[in-house]
Amino acid sequence: MGEFNEKKTTCGTVCLKYLLFTYNCCFWLAGLAVMAVGIWTLALKSDYISLLASGTYLATAYILVVAGTVVMVTGVLGCCATFKERRNLLRLYFILLLIIFLLEIIAGILAYAYYQQLNTELKENLKDTMTKRYHQPGHEAVTSAVDQLQQEFHCCGSNNSQDWRDSEWIRSQEAGGRVVPDSCCKTVVALCGQRDHASNIYKVEGGCITKLETFIQEHLRVIGAVGIGIACVQVFGMIFTCCLYRSLKLEHY
């Protein structure tokens, strides 16, 4: 009877080892995906960060990059801990899983919270950012972001083209008689912003604020879904780790 129980325990341990190894392979790939989403956000989708008053959007992306990197390292550690049957490594692996779990939950919560407050933030700050910083010394990133925003989304001004009447640059001699930036024009040529007729510039209902809000919200949904989704998967990893740790402890005795 004792021999049967011992074989049963050993068989259970082997099954757990292979189950945890398979999980770690998938977990490593998930870490790569998380890091890729973070880098994708920072490298390709961060053009408009200079237009945002809050750093939350940027913070969520950095958290995903860090979490993804740690996930990949942890996945390798998990494989080593599993096949070497080292309980101290399993403890470390579990702690790292818990840390990553918390990081991804935080990223998901930040993305969701910022999603809720984005409309208010843009309404309060976007017009001031565009009119007070556009073409001003030291704000080249804002100038570039505004021009790209207006060209990419075919819009002009925060709410409408009339917003540019309050622009410090438009009211200066440097504007060369423009009433809107050239990036508002349907066909961009030098000094095309001198005429703000509908046939010449983009007049979109809701202005650039609506377009930017939709753009940011779409990416916040991706960040939030990835963060929360991977965090949920990690719960199974922690359960498998606890089961294997307990199984090894029983065999030890």
From Swiss-Prot:
Effect annotated for changing N159Q: Unable to modulate the glycosylation pattern of integrin ITGA3 subunit
Annotated InterPro entries: Tetraspanin/Peripherin, Tetraspanin_animals, Tetraspanin_CS, Tetraspanin_EC2_sf
Outcome of substituting K7R: Complete loss of RNF128-mediated ubiquitination
GO-annotated molecular function: integrin binding
One GO location term (cellular component): membrane
Glycosylation sites: N159
Pfam families linked: Tetraspanin (PF00335)
CDD domains, per database record: CD151_like_LEL
Highest taxon of the lineage: Eukaryota
Keywords assigned by UniProt, alphabetized: Blood group antigen, Cell membrane, Deafness, Epidermolysis bullosa, Glycoprotein, Host-virus interaction, Lipoprotein, Membrane, Palmitate, Transmembrane, Transmembrane helix, Ubl conjugation
PTM entry text: Palmitoylated. Palmitoylation by ZDHHC2 regulates CD151 expression, association with other tetraspanin family proteins and function in cell adhesion. Ubiquitinated by RNF128 on lysine residues present in the tetraspanin amino terminus via 'Lys-48'-linked ubiquitin leading to proteasomal degradation.
Residue ranges, Extracellular side: 40-57, 113-221
Cited SUPFAM superfamilies: Tetraspanin
UniProt disease link: Epidermolysis bullosa simplex 7, with nephropathy and deafness: A form of epidermolysis bullosa, a genodermatosis characterized by recurrent blistering, fragility of the skin and mucosal epithelia, and erosions caused by minor mechanical trauma. EBS7 is an autosomal recessive disorder characterized by the association of skin blistering, hereditary nephritis, sensorineural deafness, and beta-thalassemia minor. Skin blistering is present at birth, particularly in the tibial area but also scattered on other parts of the body.
Chain ranges passing through the membrane: 19-39, 58-78, 92-112, 222-242
Expressed in which tissues: Expressed in a variety of tissues including vascular endothelium and epidermis. Expressed on erythroid cells, with a higher level of expression in erythroid precursors than on mature erythrocytes. Acts as a sensitive T-cell activation marker.
Induction behaviour: On both CD4 and CD8 T-cells following TCR/CD3 activation.
GO biological process, alphabetically ordered: cell adhesion; cell migration; positive regulation of cell migration; positive regulation of endocytosis; T cell proliferation; wound healing, spreading of cells
Name of the protein: CD151 antigen
